[in-house]
Amino acid sequence: MSIHEDTNLLNQLNQATLSRRSFLQWSAATGAAALLTSNVNLVNGLYPLEQALAAAGDIQVIPTGCAHNCGGRCVLKAHVQDGIIIRITSDTDRPDDPLDPQLRACVRGRSYRRRVYAPDRLKSPLRRTGPRGSGLYEEISWEEAVDTVAENLIRVKETYGNSAIYSHYATGGGSTTAGSGTAARLLDLFGGRLGYYNNYSWACVQVATPTVYGTQNTGQSRLDWLNSKLILMWGWNPAEMIDGTNTMYFVKQARAAGAKTIVIDPRHTMSAVGLADEWIPIRPGTDTAMMAAMAYVLITEGLIDENFVNTYALGFDADHMPAGYENAESFKAYILGESDGVPKTPAWAEEYTGVPADTIARIGREYGTTKPAMLYQGYGIQRRAYGEQVVRMGCVLPALTGNIGIPGGWASGIAFAIGGESAPGAGFPSVANAVPYSVPSYMYTDAVLRGAEMGRADGVRGLAEGEETLPTGIKLLYNAAGNCLANQHGNINRTKEILADESLAEFIVVHEQFLTPSAKFADIILPACTFMETFGMTGNWKYGPSRVLLPKVIEPLYGTKSDYAIAAMIAERLGIYDEYTEGGKTEEDWYNQWIQTLTTDNAAVYGDAEAFTARGSMTVPYTENPPVAFADFIADPVANPLTTPSGLVEIFSPALAAMNKPEEIPAIPKFIVEWDSPWSPEAENYPLQAIGNHYMHRVHSTLDNIDWMDEAFPQRVFINPADATERGIQEGDMVRIWNDRGAMIIPARVTPRIMPGVVNIPQGAWYTPDADGVDRRGCVNVLTSERPSPLALGNTQQTMMVQVEKV
C-alpha cells in the first residue's frame, strides 16, 4: 500500500506541523512499506503537500540535506515560518528518473526538527566542576572558554610537543564546515598533531581488500547490479545502514530484472524482509567457515573457473604458487584438508555456522552455476576478532567463479566504485600535518595510557630510523562532533577509567550539541550549532554521485556556533586566525566560494551557481553502460596488471606470509575460531553471542536522545524465543545482560527474527549508568572489547559473549 492511499495519514501529513503521534504512525506505516515504495514515483510524491503548506501562510521551503553518517546523504526540505522550522519533508518535487533518482530521506532525517529544538541542546560554553564523567559543569563565557582551550594547547605544545595533541576520530559533523576536519585544520596550522589511520566502520576491509586486489576500488556502479542474476547479501543490510542513498532502490531494480537475492545474517533484517528471496541465519563470526565450505563444493564438484584461477590468480593450487613459496600451503590444499587433515566440507562448516550442510552445498552450487553473480559483504562481519579473514575469503570466491571484471559480477571486498559513483566536491584547502606519527584509531586509549611505550608492533607509523616508540603519550584530546571518545569505543568501563585519570590526558576539549557520554569527560565543552544553523555542503558516502548544499536555514540557537567558527575563535588566540580563515572568511564565504568553484570547474554537472543554489542538490546521472571494475585486467592481464606485487589476484599473499604470523595472519584466508566465541572458555559463563546492529532509531549515536525516535524504535535486546523460554523471559521483561566487562538492564524483545544462541543490542545508545555502574539505556560497548584485530588493528566490537537473565 502506498502511504498516499491512506486518507487519514494524508490528512495528518497535511497539517502545518507534524505531531509526535503522526510521526509514530507514519514511521510504523512506512517501516515496511518504505522497502516496497522506496524511490518509486509515488503519486506525485509529497509535492502537493509542500505547495499546500506554502500557500497556507508565510512559509519558506528551503532545500537542505541530511548530513550525518548513516551511509546516505539525502535531501531534506526545511519548512520555515517566522524563523522557526515547522516541518521537514524530502526530495519529492522533481522527476524520479531511474538514472537520476530522488534522494529521499528516511525517518531519521525527517525527525531532524526534534534534534534542532531538543530541550537538552547545549546553550553556552561549560567548564567542568566535578570529576570527569560526572556531568557536573558550570556556564562560562565564550571568551573564557576559548582562552582556556588556547592556553592548554600552548602549554601542552611547549611541554610535550605537538605529538601530544590528538584530534579524535569523529563522524558526527557530516558537513564541510562541521566536524573533526575543522579541528584537524586548526591543529595542523598550530604545528601538527598525532594522527590516526583506519576508522571504526571498515578498518579490516580497508586493509584486507588490497592484499587480494592491490586496491580498495573493487566495486562498480550500482546500476550494474541490474546485470546480476544472483546477489548474496552477506551480512549486508542496506535497508537500515543505508550504504548510499538509493541502494535499496538498485537492489529492487536488480530483483525486478530477474536477480535472486539471498540474505545471510544472524538477524532477519529489514533487508531480509523487503529485499530477499531467502534468509539464511548464521552464527556470528563463522561466515568464513561457510565461505570455505562453499569453496569446497566448487572445487570438488568441478565448478571452478579454471581459466580464471590459472590466468589471473596466484596461490590457488600448488602449480600457481609464488616464487619462494612453492612448497607453502595453497588455498586448494587448505580447503581439501590436504595440509591440516580437515576437509572444509559443508558438514564441517555446519558445526560452526549452524547452517545445515545441505543449505551450504546448495548455496555453493548456486553461486558456482549462476553467472554473473554478486557476493556483497556487509561491514559488520569484518568488525570482528579476525575480520580480515572473512574479507579475503569473500574476495576469493568471486575469483574461483570468474565473477571479476564482468558486468553483473562483483569482486567483493570494500568495493569502492570505479566510475559512475562520484560527484565533484569542494572543501577547505589541505594543510600538512607536521607531526609524522599516527596510530590506529581504535587504539587511541593505548596512546593515552602508554603512548611513550608504543612502537611499530603497536601499529605506530611514521617512526624514523632509530626511533623505537612515540616520544610521548596523548596529553590533550580535541574531540569535535564525535561520540567515539567514550560511548562508541570498545570496553567503555576501561575507557572511562583512562579518560578520568587527569595525569594521563591532561586536558580534553569537546565541541558538542548535547551533553553526550563522551562530552561528560571534557574539561571544556564548546556548544556547536546544527548544520541547519550554518552553511555547508555534503555528499558522497561510499555510493551516491551527489552533492547536497546545506544553506543556513535558521539562525544559530542560544549561544551556539558552528565548528568552523569555534575553531576560528581559538585560532585567533593562537595567532593563526588569518591562516585558518584565509583572511577572515566566514562559513557563508566558504560556502559561496565552493559553489562558485564547483559550477565553474564542473559546469556540465552542476550548471551555473544560481541554478545549483536554487535546486540545492545535484546528482551526476548514471550512464547506461557503467565501467566495470578490473575489466581491463581481464582483457589483458599483462598490459593491465593489478597493483598487487604479483600483478594478479593474490589468493596467497607473499606479503602476509613474510609477516610470519600464520596463526592470526595466514597467507591464505582461513577460518579462525574467535577469542570470544561459543568454542572459547568464555562460553562456560557467557553462553550467548551478542552483536550490535545499525538501528533505524539513530545514526550510530546521533539522534539517540530524540523523543520521537525513542518511541518509534525503542532500545531493547532482541532474543530468540528458545533462549528466552530457557531463561523465563517474556516480551517486555526487564533483563540483565552482562559479561566480565560490564552489565546493562533493558527490556527484552522476544522474536524469531534472530537465531537461537545470539542476542542483538542495537549499537549507539547513550551510556547511562546507575549508581552501581550498570548501564540502563543499552550501550552495547559496556560489553565489547578494546582488543584490536591482528592485521588491521581495527575494532572488533561485534565479537562478544554474554549472559542474559530476567530481573
Report each predicted region and the residues it spans.
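Extended redox/cofactor-interaction regions of prokaryotic respiratory oxidoreductases
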Residues: 2-11, 181-251, 257-259, 263-264, ...
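Phosphate/diphosphate-binding loops
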Residues: 506-507, 552-571
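Short beta-alpha connecting loops at secondary-structure transitions
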Residues: 276-282, 545-556
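N-terminal export/assembly segments and adjacent metallocofactor-ligating motifs
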Residues: 2-304, 331, 459, 480, ...
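Active-site phosphate/pyrophosphate-binding segments
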Residues: 327-453
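Long, well-ordered, tryptophan-enriched scaffold segments
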Residues: 267-370
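A glycine-rich phosphate-binding loop feature that marks nucleotide/adenosyl-phosphate handling sites
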Residues: 170, 311-315, 367, 410-421, ...
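Long, contiguous, secondary-structure-rich segments that constitute the structural scaffold
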Residues: 563-615, 701-703, 707-718, 722-807
